[in-house]
Swiss-Prot record:
Top-rank lineage group of the source organism: Bacteria
Protein name in the entry: Surface presentation of antigens protein SpaK
SUPFAM superfamilies assigned: Type III secretory system chaperone-like
Record keyword Transmembrane helix present: no
Family named by the database record: Belongs to the SpaK family.
Record bears the keyword Chaperone: yes
Length: 133
């Protein structure tokens, strides 16, 4: 995956989605690219170990809320995400946040149209998790 231009990939996918060029600020491939959203956590995109990773940080729920939502969270985690290297989304927990994460298969990171589909599907998973939490 050495020849990926992450900035161009993200820019092309945002144009495909319909984002006006005026709101796409200078993108930098030396750090995570952040797509800020109005009513949801930001989507972060970066190359990690030469693979494209997407993640979003949700406020960490209480243990009680996490336990009461476990069934719905498990269903979300078991939904197929065909663009991912393991065909699933991952969920990581820390004291501050619950992180929804996916590492994208190399085959899908060279086309802005395909990457727009990935962003859309990841956003749909974010909506599900947000509704559960």
């Amino acid at each position: 995956m050495s020849n990926i231009n992450l900035v161009q990939l993200v820019r092309d996918s945002l144009f495909t989605i319909g984002c006006p060029p005026s709101i796409i600020t200078d993108l930098d491939s030396h750090s995570a690219i952040t797509i800020s959203l109005d009513s949801m956590p930001a989507i972060n995109i970066a190359l990690v170990n030469e693979q494209v990773m997407l993640w979003a940080n949700f406020d960490a729920p209480s243990d009680v809320k996490l336990q009461s939502s476990a069934y719905n969270i498990l269903n979300l985690m078991l939904m197929n995400f065909s663009y991912s290297i393991n065909e699933l989304v991952e969920l990581h927990r820390s004291d501050e946040y619950l992180q929804l994460r996916v590492v994208i298969k190399d085959d899908y990171v060279h086309d802005g149209i395909v990457f727009a589909e990935i962003l859309h599907e990841f956003y749909q998973r974010m909506e599900i998790l947000n509704g559960v939490l």
